[in-house]
Amino acid sequence: RAIDLYTGKIKWTYTGVKGYIETRPLIEEDKVIFGAWDNTLYALNKNTGEELWKWTGGLTRMHFSPAAVWPVAANGKVFITDPQRAMTAIDLATGETIWRTYQSTVRETIGLSTDKKRVYSKTMNDSIVCYSTQGDKPHQLWSSNVGFGYEHAPSMQVEKDGVMFGSTKGGLIFALEPLTGKVLWKYKIGNSLFNTVVPI
């Protein structure tokens, strides 16, 4: 539902979601886009709540839902990852799949470069990968071995001031050079899961 910022009154309600929602929604153009634990990514009109499209990508098991990832958008595409270890580019206007790749075994994390030319994701073992947001086929630009081991925490990659930041389930925070993937530094703060970092 959408709630008026100043009055607290409900502006619209959408009742078509069949699973629970944990993601941060993406606001892009006239759309609000989010996934839920029902195999579905939803796009609604941000002003009215009208359903514009739904994407399932053929997912049939609830545990493969694109629900934990925070969707990002660039060049007319929405980019997501999911527990089926795939990265997907979806047409922002229609909800049709442009491409879907299992090449890097990514899972439930994604980040967008500040110039919107690249998306980042975390693999399930050691590495960060970077793909181009341009074109209609998946194009990996680099892969960087950060050395964090087995990983499945849904913490997103964040770029700021020419540095890409990330974190892990094992308490590691790291920084990479966005164009090459070169590891700039990494620091283990503890042994617990770290959520998405917020560089300031």
PLM feature spans:
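Sequence-structural signature of mature extracellular/luminal beta-sheet repeat domains
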Residues: 7, 86, 94, 118, ...
